[in-house]
Amino acid sequence: MKTKTLRRLFSMLAALVMGLSLLTGCNEKNAERTQEQEDAQTIQVYLWSTSLYENYAPYVQSQLPDVNIEFIVGNNDLDFYKFLQQNGGLPDIITCCRFSLHDAAPLKDSLMNLAMTNEAGAVYNTYLNSFKNEDGSVNWLPVCADAHGFVVNRSLFEQYDIPLPTDYASFVAACQAFEKVGIRGFTSDYTYDYTCMETLQGLSAAELTTTAGRKWRTTYSDPASTARVGLDDTVWPGAFERMEQFIQDTHLTADDLALNYDDVTGMFRNGEVAMYFGSSAGVKMFQDEGIDTIFLPFFSQNGEPWIMTTPYFQVALNRDLEQDTARREKAMKVLNVMLSEQAQNRIVSEGQDILSYSQNVPLRLTEYLKDVRSVVEENHMYIRIASNDFFAVSKDVVSKMIAGELTAEQAYQAFNAQLLADEEPADNETVLTSGKAYSNVFHANGGSAAFSVMANTLRGVYGTDVLLATANSFTGSVLQADYNQKMAASMIMPNGLMSRQRTMTGAELKETVHAFVEGCEGGFVPFNRGSLPVVSGIAVEVKENNGSYTLTGITRNGQPLGDNDTVTVTCLATEKQMEALLASDSGTSVGEDTWVKNTWRDYISGGATLAEPENYMTLR
C-alpha cells in the first residue's frame, strides 16, 4: 500500500515538474516572440552628439507617435560605424558630423541609395553634387549648415574710421590699417586642425566648385576606387598660392599656431584683434555682450564671396531596411521629419540662422547673418572636404606654411605626398573581447541588454552598490567582437559623461531614481521608452502613460527598497543633467566627480571583462 502511494506521489511530482517545465518553456518562447516583435517595431537612430538628444530627438519622436524610435548617442567618427558594420551592429539611421565621402566609402554597400527619394530631390543640386558617388547614387544627405566665415568687431572699424571689407583687397587694407594703430587685423585659433583645413579651402571655394574642382572631388571621394588619390595639378596649386598670400597679407606667424578658441575670443573681446575666423554663433555671443559684431564671408581673390559651411550632420539609412517594407516606410517617415524645417530649428543654437541645403526649408535670416544674405541667396555655401586625411594633413602643412617652413609649391607637394602615402596600420591590439552580442533595443520586460552589460560592468568598476545612468550614457555597441583601444573607448557616450558618487538612504535613493525616471526641473525628461534610464544593483517598475513615465516600485536583491537602507550610489550623466538630477544635498559625497570615459579607458587598459546583463526594468 505504501509503495503504491509513493508511486502515485512520484508520478504526480513528475507530472508537476513536466508541467512547470512546459510552462516555463512557453513563457520563454512568448518572451522571445515579444522581444522579436519589439525589435521589428523599433527604428534605431544614432545621433552624433548628445546635444541632439535633448531638443532634436524629442521633437522627432513627438511628430511620429505611432513609430517607436530609439535614439542612441553614438560617435562622431565613421570608423565607429565601420566597426558596427563589420560586426553586425549597423543601426537603421546614422548621423555623423565629421564626414567625407572618401572616409564613408567602406559603408556604401551597406547603405540605401537615396538618389530617387523626395528628400534627396529637395536638396539643391549645387550641394547634392558633393554627396553623389561616381555612379550617381546618393547614400548621405546633409541637414542645415553651420556657417563659418569672419567674425568682425564693427565698433573697432568705426572707432578707427576703417572701412568694412567688401572684397579681398579691402580686407587686406583693413588688416594693414589696424596694424598701424597696434591692433591685429586678423588671427584665429590655428592650433586646431579644422581651422587650418577650412582656411585653406575657404580661400579657394570659388575654384574648388568649378567643373575641374568638382571633377577632382568626385574622383577623390569615389567609393568604388581603392587607390589613394592625391591633389590635381589644375585647381590645387593655386589654392596653396592663395593660402601663402593670405598668410603674408595677415602677417600670421608661428605664434598664431599656439592660439586656441579661448585665446582668440579673449583677444576679440578685449579689442586686440578686429577679425577672426569662426562660426556665426560668435556674432550672437558678442552682441549679447554689447560688442557690435557682424559676420562676413570669405573674399575670394577672384572677387566672389563665399561662406564655408559644414552640415550639422549627414544622415544615411541602412540598406537592410529594404528587406522589410513596413520598416522601410517607418524609417523614411523618420528621415522626412529629421530633415523638416521644424526639426532643423532644434539643431541650431539659440539665435543662429537655419542655412538649409534643402529647397523645402525657406530662407529666414536673423540680424546675425543679414550681411551675407546675397551670398546665401546665390548658393555660395561651400561644403568643406572633411576626410580624416584632410584634417590631419591640413594641420601639418598649413601650420608649416604659417611658420614659414614651406612655400606654396613645397606645401602643395607635401600635401599631395601625404595623401598618396600608404596609410599607417591602425593600432589593432585587442584590449577587450566580447564572446556574445547583446541587443541594444529597449524591451518592456527587462530594458536594454547591452546597456545593462555596461551598467553592471561599471558598477563593479566603481565598487558601488547601485549605479544609475541616463539613457544617453552608452553607445550600445556590445557586439561579439574583439575591440581595440579606440573601439572599446567608443562604448561610452563621447560628450562629457561624468560620474558622481554618494552614500544615500533608501529614501534618498528613491527620490533620485524618481528624478531619473520622471525627469526634473532644469534636467532631462524621458520622452519615450528608449530614453528611460539604465540602472544596476536595483530593479525598477515604471508605468507608461502616453509618453510620460511614473516610477511605481524599486527592489534590491528581490526585496522592496527600505527607506532606512544605506547604499553607495554612482550616477552617470552630463554635467548639465547631473546638476539637475543630483543636488549637492542628495546623500553624502564620496570622492570627486570623474569623467566616465577616463575611468573606462583605464579599466579596459588593465584587461577588462564584461558583466552579464540583468532585467533591470519592467515597463507596464
Residue spans for each PLM region:
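Extracytoplasmic/periplasmic solute-binding protein
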Residues: N139, V172-R228
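Hinge/lid segment of periplasmic solute-binding proteins
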Residues: C97-H148, P163, V172, E198-T199, ...
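Extracytoplasmic "Venus flytrap"/periplasmic binding protein-like
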Residues: S62-T126, S155-T166, G266-M267, A274-M275, ...
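Long, aromatic- and glycine/proline-rich binding clefts that accommodate carbohydrate-like moieties
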Residues: L296, R346-K400
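Catalytic centers of hydrolytic enzymes
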Residues: D427-R620
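Conserved N-terminal structural module of periplasmic/extracytoplasmic solute-binding proteins
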Residues: L20, C26-L101, L164, Q410, ...
